[in-house]
Regions:
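Non-ligating segments of multi-cofactor redox enzymes
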Residues: 1-289
């Protein structure tokens, strides 16, 4: 500073080579190792291509779902059922068990902290499937809301839905309920928002503790570690959720899932919601039940 005479020092990194005339034998060849995430992406080109095809197919089917429903009849529901079953099965087998590409609330918490404190692209690019999945989820949430991911593409949600449908086909349909009794449903549906808010608050105290508490999601037990590799508390919790899925449609998704609660926030700003038809009355029951 010319006025005060104080000095300010700045540190920075920059490559520097001496001129070749000062080096015996010329400048040496330096092979720089490529970033780890680049190596991972290159090594899984085929799976990435298949995953992108799956995402494209899912987006196309969901965009055309109204046309598929119109082509279906009460006796022939193949047009609306088969694409949905295909996405459920591939979500469980290919995306969940094979690619291990299971979006989780921990990734949402990491995203929050990265925005507030330090953003590192390498962290998000380290898993190509999770990275691509989240780009697709964010875009689809603002187009159609969380319904596409939660209802058609989530590996655990698909597993829970298939368990419910298979149980119905095996003769348990008369014992099944779409929802808990209405007075219970109206209260319990808010629990997942409390779980999400609690995990987000805890993460600012201790991210490690938040990650442990986030195992309220059974995703890790189901796909990443395997239920046979967990201790009895995890096995018990997982088994209770599975048993509940036999009799109630997606109980975890409706009442406990913090990821669904997190996605509900941007879903408020979706471009396309439930469509009203000329036959619609003023009851708005569909918006309350599915919106």
């Amino acid at each position: 500073d010319q006025q005060t005479g104080s000095r300010t020092f700045v540190n920075f990194d920059r490559e520097y080579w001496l001129p070749e005339r000062y080096l015996e034998g010329g400048r040496p060849e330096i092979v720089k190792p490529e970033a780890t995430w680049v190596t991972v992406w290159k090594s899984r080109k085929l799976e990435i291509g298949l995953f992108l095809l799956w995402l494209t197919a899912a987006g196309t089917v969901y965009a055309l779902r109204d046309k598929l429903v119109r082509r279906s009849t009460m006796k022939d529901t193949r047009w609306k059922d088969y694409p949905k079953y295909f996405l459920w099965i591939t979500s469980i087998g290919f995306v969940g068990f094979y690619l291990l590409a299971v979006p989780s609330i921990t990734q949402v918490l990491t995203w929050f902290h990265s925005i507030l404190f330090e953003w590192k692209w390498e962290l998000f690019l380290s898993d190509p499937f999770i990275f691509l999945f989240w780009i697709f989820i964010i875009v689809s949430v603002f187009f159609w809301g969380r319904g596409m991911f939660c209802g058609w593409m989530c590996p655990y949600g698909s597993l829970s839905e298939l368990v419910y449908h298979v149980a119905g086909k095996l003769g348990l349909k008369r014992y099944q309920r779409h929802l808990l009794p209405q007075h219970w449903h109206d209260r319990l549906k808010w629990v997942k928002y409390g779980v999400f808010a609690g995990l987000l608050a805890v993460s600012f105290y201790s991210m490690g503790l938040a990650e442990k508490l986030s195992e309220v999601e059974p995703f890790k037990t189901t796909f990443l570690v395997g239920v046979w590799n967990r201790s009895w508390p995890f096995v018990t919790f997982w088994s209770v959720l599975l048993a509940a899925s036999v009799f109630f449609e997606r109980p975890f998704c409706k009442y406990l899932c913090p990821l669904g609660a997190a996605l509900a926030v941007p879903s408020t700003f979706r471009w396309w919601g439930l469509k009203r038809k000329k036959e619609c009355g003023p009851c708005a029951a569909c918006a309350v039940g599915c919106g």
